[in-house]
Amino acid sequence: MNQSMDPKQEQRVWSRVMSAQAVRCTQEPEVCRRLEQKDIPVFDESAAMELYAAQCSAAMTYRCLAEMARGCARQALVRLAESRRCDGKRLSALYFVMTGLKACPERPKPPCVSCLNEALRQAYREERCTAELYSRYAANAGEYACTLEQLGENACKRAQELLNILQISL
């Protein structure tokens, strides 16, 4: 029994679907919203903890995306998750140097992903914004500037890798 919709009904359904997607697509990643502030951020203990928590969350996101992907895209996403985890460990070490305390952020919740390509797009944008944020932090970070610059370079490399994955999957 193959029932087809009349063209007007089909158009209404697609317009609802596309408008819902447009709302999701226009939401800026949290990191990008932080960049809207014009002042140069100061890298302190709270910034280190916040960045560490963001790295843990992104690593979880990449692991979840890897479960959805196939082939070389899956392998690349696993590498990206590992890269984020390693950068998180670096930030954890910086936090320990700054405070003498072990960084223990809340365990990140797995993301709700409905579309792999849209999630990759958001991850790409977040990596680009993360690279810019690290660059801004490095400008005022004193002894931690070199490490933050390296973390920013890592974010740029991850953004490029995400772009490569998108090229394959589209």
Show where each model-derived region lies.
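Non-heme di-metal
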Residues: N2-L170
